[in-house]
């Protein structure tokens, strides 16, 4: 399998990208090098290799949820630069 200049132009058109002729030639060359390298994997003998879905056998380490005392509302409001009744006033970030 190889990549042609026509393939590069087609993908560029789909992505709405424009390239110079030299860049297209470079893409063709680079992509063909990558594909040739990947074809070397076909030469590997994998008969004795077990199928592995995930090479990392990591288990989640869960911890117990510990309820801790949080700040009282009055303390939060007292520490806020601006507040209105029970609400902290913050600068507008979305129009």
UniProtKB/Swiss-Prot annotation:
Keyword terms: ATP-binding, Ligase, Nucleotide-binding, Protein biosynthesis
NCBIfam families found in the cross-reference section: gatC
Listed GO MF terms: asparaginyl-tRNA synthase (glutamine-hydrolyzing) activity; ATP binding; glutaminyl-tRNA synthase (glutamine-hydrolyzing) activity
Any one biological process term the GO annotation gives: translation
Native source species: Clostridium botulinum (strain Langeland / NCTC 10281 / Type F)
Highest taxon of source: Bacteria
Family: Belongs to the GatC family.
Subunit-level organization: Heterotrimer of A, B and C subunits.
InterPro entries: Asp/Glu-ADT_sf_sub_c, GatC
Protein role: Allows the formation of correctly charged Asn-tRNA(Asn) or Gln-tRNA(Gln) through the transamidation of misacylated Asp-tRNA(Asn) or Glu-tRNA(Gln) in organisms which lack either or both of asparaginyl-tRNA or glutaminyl-tRNA synthetases. The reaction takes place in the presence of glutamine and ATP through an activated phospho-Asp-tRNA(Asn) or phospho-Glu-tRNA(Gln).
PANTHER family listed in its UniProt record: GLUTAMYL-TRNA(GLN) AMIDOTRANSFERASE SUBUNIT C, MITOCHONDRIAL
Bridged cysteine pairs (disulfide): none
Substrates-to-products reaction catalysed: L-glutamyl-tRNA(Gln) + L-glutamine + ATP + H2O = L-glutaminyl-tRNA(Gln) + L-glutamate + ADP + phosphate + H(+); L-aspartyl-tRNA(Asn) + L-glutamine + ATP + H2O = L-asparaginyl-tRNA(Asn) + L-glutamate + ADP + phosphate + 2 H(+)
Name of the protein this chain belongs to: Aspartyl/glutamyl-tRNA(Asn/Gln) amidotransferase subunit C
Keyword check for Nucleotide-binding: yes
EC number: 6.3.5.-
Pfam families: GatC (PF02686)
The encoding gene: gatC
